[in-house]
Amino acid sequence: MIKRRAVYPGSFDPITNGHLDILRRALGLVDEVVIAIAYNHEKPSGLFSVDERIEMIREVTAAFGEKIRIDSFHG
């Protein structure tokens, strides 16, 4: 069976209830959502480091189980 996957890019600095609402809605349409955290070392740092954002997202999306994957990219 083919897995339906969505990519949700953003800075997530920090993740908000609005982000979580979009994730819930997306998971009603696809099997997996990849949260792609954007960062740019050439710009001033935001509120949280990439590692802190990843940890926050892991904590608040734990209930979604393996339907959520978190990655980061430079952009």
Annotate each PLM feature.
Residues 1-75:
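Nucleotidyltransferase catalytic core that binds NTPs
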